[in-house]
C-alpha cells in the first residue's frame, strides 16, 4: 500500500486505542533497515510506523552531506517507494527532536509537507516528534502549541514528550531520577495547552520510568499506572465519563520491558511503542557472526586474496535484514497488532 494517508494513520491509531493494541515504531537509518521493518510488518499482517531520528537521518545522508533534512527526505522517499509494494499500511514519523534542532530538522520538514499539501498532495511524513523534556514544561508546551498549529495545517500529527525518558538516544540524554515519572499536574497542563484534539491531533509521550538503551529488568521501576492516572485526570478535566482515554500515549525506552508491563500500558491507551535498541542488536548480531565465521575470507590474510562471496556486503546485510525482520515481527506480536492491518478490513 502507499504510505498511510493522514486519514488512514488516524484510523490506525483510533482502532489501536479502542482495541488495546499498539504499533511498533521502528527506528531506521538505511534502506536495509527500512526493508527489514516493512517486511516484518507485512509478515505479521500488521500496519506499522517507521521513524528517523536526527542522528539516523544525518547518517543516511552520507559522510559527504551530513544533513538531517536531506537524509530524512531521502529515507522517506525510499520508504514511500518500497511500502507501495506491500499489502499493509506504513506511517512515517521523525523521532526525538530537541529545541536546538527544531529549526534544522522538524520545522523544515513541516514546511516541505505544507508545500505538498498546498498542491493537493499528502504530507511527506505522517507525524513528527517534538522533545521538550529538557526544558521547563511551560516552555515545552508553549513550543508544542506553536508546532501543533503548523502540524495540523499540514495534516500532520505532533508527538509531544512531557517528563524525561532516562538514558541516552542520539545525544538526547535524560538522568534517571524522579522526573522519569510524569505528574498529574503535567497532564492537566497538557490538556490546558494542547486541548484534546480540537487544535490538532497529537500523541503524548508521558514518562512512567522509561529508559532508553539496554537495562536489566528491575534496575528501573516502570509504573504504567501513571498512564491510567493521566487518563483519569484528563477525563475529569474535560468532563468526560469515567473510563475515557483522552490521550494517545507513546511508550519510549521499552527495551527489556516485561511482557506484563507492556500489556498493562496497552490497556491505558498506549498506541505507539518505539523500538530501536532491540532491532539494532538483531541487525548487528548476524553480521558479527558472519565476520567471525568467515574471518579468513573477509580479510586478506598472509597475502591471500580473501573470498569475494563473503566480503560482498550483500552476503551479510541479507542476514542482518532477515534477523531484524524477525524482531519486528516479534514486536508486532508483543503489541497485539499482528493480523490487524486496516488494509485487510
Curated annotation (Swiss-Prot):
Positions annotated to bind Zn(2+) 2: 131, 161
Name of the protein in question: Fructose-bisphosphate aldolase
What is the main EC category here? lyase
Amino acids binding dihydroxyacetone phosphate: 213, 253-255, 274-277
| Catalysed reactions listed for this entry | beta-D-fructose 1,6-bisphosphate = D-glyceraldehyde 3-phosphate + dihydroxyacetone phosphate
Q: State what this protein does.
A: Catalyzes the aldol condensation of dihydroxyacetone phosphate (DHAP or glycerone-phosphate) with glyceraldehyde 3-phosphate (G3P) to form fructose 1,6-bisphosphate (FBP) in gluconeogenesis and the reverse reaction in glycolysis.
**Positions with a binding annotation for Zn(2+) 1:** 96, 212, 252
* Top-rank lineage group of the source organism: Bacteria
Instruction: Give the PANTHER family listed for this entry.
Output: FRUCTOSE-BISPHOSPHATE ALDOLASE (PTHR30559:SF0), FRUCTOSE-BISPHOSPHATE ALDOLASE CLASS 2 (PTHR30559)
One GO molecular function term of this record is: fructose-bisphosphate aldolase activity
Residue positions annotated to bind D-glyceraldehyde 3-phosphate are 53
Q: How is the cofactor bound?
A: Binds 2 Zn(2+) ions per subunit. One is catalytic and the other provides a structural contribution.
Amino acid at each position: 500500500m502507499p504510505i498511510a494517508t493522514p486519514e488512514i494513520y488516524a484510523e490506525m491509531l483510533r482502532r489501536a486505542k479502542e482495541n488495546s493494541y499498539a504499533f511498533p515504531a521502528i527506528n531506521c537509518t538505511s534502506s536495509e533497515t527500512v526493508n527489514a521493518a516493512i517486511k516484518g510488518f507485512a509478515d505479521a499482517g500488521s500496519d506499522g510506523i517507521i521513524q528517523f531520528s536526527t542522528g539516523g537521518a544525518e547518517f543516511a545522508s552520507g559522510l559527504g552531506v551530513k544533513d538531517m533534512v536531506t537524509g530524512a527526505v531521502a529515507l522517506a522517499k525510499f520508504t514511500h517507494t518500497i511500502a507501495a509494494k506491500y499489502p499493509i499500511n506504513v506511517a512515517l514519523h521523525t523521532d526525538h527532536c530537541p529545541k536546538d534542532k527544531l529549526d534544522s530538522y522538524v520545522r523544515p520538514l513541516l514546511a516541505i509537507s505544507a508545500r505538498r499539501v498546498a498542491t493537493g498532495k499528502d504530507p511527506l511524513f505522517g507525524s513528527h516528534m517534538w522533545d521538550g523534556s529538557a526544558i521547563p514544561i511551560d516552555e515545552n508546551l508553549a513550543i508544542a502549541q506553536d508546532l501543533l498549529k503548523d502540524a495540523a495545517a499540514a495534516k500532520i500529527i505532533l508527538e509531544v514528550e512531557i517528563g524525561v525518558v532516562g538514558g541516552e538516544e542520539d545525544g538526547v540524554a535524560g538522568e534517571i531520577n524522579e522526573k522519569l515519572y510524569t505528574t498529574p499536574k503535567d497532564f492537566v497542563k497538557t490538556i490546558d495547552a494542547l486541548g484534546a484534539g480540537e487544535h490538532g491531533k497529537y500523541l503524548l509521550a508521558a514518562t512512567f520510568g522509561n529508559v532508553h538503551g539496554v537495562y536489566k529488568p528491575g534496575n528501573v521501576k516502570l509504573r504504567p499506572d501513571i498512564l491510567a492516572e493521566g487518563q483519569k485526570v484528563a477525563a475529569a478535566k474535560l468532563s468526560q465519563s469515567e473510563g475515557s482515554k483522552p490521550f494517545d500515549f507513546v511508550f519510549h525506552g521499552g527495551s527489556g520491558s516485561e511482557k506484563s508491563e507492556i500489556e498493562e500500558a496497552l490497556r491505558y491507551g498506549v498506541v505507539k511503542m518505539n523500538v530501536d535498541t532491540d532491532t539494532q542488536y538483531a541487525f548487528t548480531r548476524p553480521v558479527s557472526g558472519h565476520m567471525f565465521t568467515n574471518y579468513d575470507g573477509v580479510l586478506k590474510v598472509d597475502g591471500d586474496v580473501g573470498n569475494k562471496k563473503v566480503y560482498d556486503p550483500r552476503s551479510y546485510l541479507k542476514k542482518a535484514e532477515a534477523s531484524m525482520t524477525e524482531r519486528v515481527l516479534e514486536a508486532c506480536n508483543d503489541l497485539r497488532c499482528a493480523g490487524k492491518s486496516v488494509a485487510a478490513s
